Amino acid sequence: MEQTWRWYGPNDPVSLDDIRQAGATGIVTALHHIPNGEVWPVEEIKKRQAELAQKGLTWSVVESIPVHEDIKTHTGQYDRYIASYQQSIRNLAACGIDTVCYNFMPILDWTRTDLEYTLPDGSKALRFDHIAFAAFELHILKRDGARHDYTDDEQRQAQDYFSAMSEAQIETLTRNIIAGLPGAEEGYTLDQFRARLSEYDHIDKTALRDNMAYFLKAIVPVAEEAGVRLAVHPDDPPRPILGLPRIVSTIEDMQWLKETVDSIHNGFTMCTGSYGVRADNDLVRMVETFADRIHFTHLRSTCREANPKTFHEAAHLYGDVDMVAVVKAILTEEQRRKKAGDLRPIPFRPDHGHQMLDDLRKKTNPGYSAIGRLKGLAEVRGVELALKKVLFPDLL
């Protein structure tokens, strides 16, 4: 497994020198300064590669080339944006970059309600509170039809939650949900967000699948020709929110994606923290079923709370994800590939570390502080090494 680290570019508080000291050799990044929907020029790709090479690092995975909303809704200039996406894939391949992570989540990428949830040990984690989110939908956003998505009891709890909120708390919750978390390409005001939601009024799960199928049938052949592996990231959280459909949340969704364009280049990012939020997602079975299509992994854990729709980010080796079993399944696939002549290790990155130690006194990107991810990387590295020593000595 290749040890990688997500870096948000020159403005990231975590420097390339920091990353190198953490033990990562590969960088997961994107050209965040290129507007969504525009082609990534070869010159800009090479410039970023040179910046990394100066520190002895390589650009291992693109995360992400954003999928424009016109593509997801199949409206406006979707064909132009698909053509731009195709050319960006070609340009990345020309520079030797062969793995692209992306997602097809409508409007929002990943969603949390609390970015500073204090754990018993004093460190801070990200949290999704189902009732807080209901309060946002019902009483702040006031989305039409939102009541149909919540039980009577949930609506009562949301009313009580909202009634106890101060103006500052309302502002913070709103900002956390719609202003854009790290990796998101867009943030919104409430009115902008309502307008964007209205674009999905007539798009259900079937229609969104149709739009994604159109996209895949256009870009996978280009990826095949260029030798690029596409790796779709799951929905986070992996269920419908805000009345929006979600189509990359379960093993059934993965099967649909595989069958829609049956190519090894149409693959997956195995994000254990996203898929693992659902108790009905068997992560090891997912890895084993789609092993040859897993081109990238995000290894983190979450912990479901008393309300199973509420969760927080757990320590990497604890929570609801059996990290040892997942890493074993990944190494089993890596061993199979090695025997078949594919010597490329499967890249993984430690996802969403806790904010801890002196990072508590620093400005950090939510979920992407240095020390929490350093801890996660070291822990997963230890699991990997122990498994290799005992079960996979030929991978050492």
Curated annotation (Swiss-Prot):
Keywords: Iron, Lyase, Manganese
Pathway per the UniProt entry: Carbohydrate metabolism; pentose and glucuronate interconversion
InterPro entries (UniProt xref): Man_deHydtase (IPR004628), Xyl_isomerase-like_sf (IPR036237)
Source organism, top-level taxon: Bacteria
Keyword Lyase: yes
Physiological role: Catalyzes the dehydration of D-mannonate.
SUPFAM superfamilies xrefs: Xylose isomerase-like
Reactions catalysed, as given in the entry: D-mannonate = 2-dehydro-3-deoxy-D-gluconate + H2O
Identification of the protein by name: Mannonate dehydratase
HAMAP family linked to this entry: UxuA
Disulphide linkage map: none
GO MF entries: ferrous iron binding; manganese ion binding; mannonate dehydratase activity
Similarity section: Belongs to the mannonate dehydratase family.
Pfam families, alphabetized: UxuA
Cofactor(s), names only, from the UniProt record: Fe(2+); Mn(2+)
Key word Thylakoid present: no
E.C. number(s) listed in UniProt: 4.2.1.8
Example GO biological process: D-glucuronate catabolic process
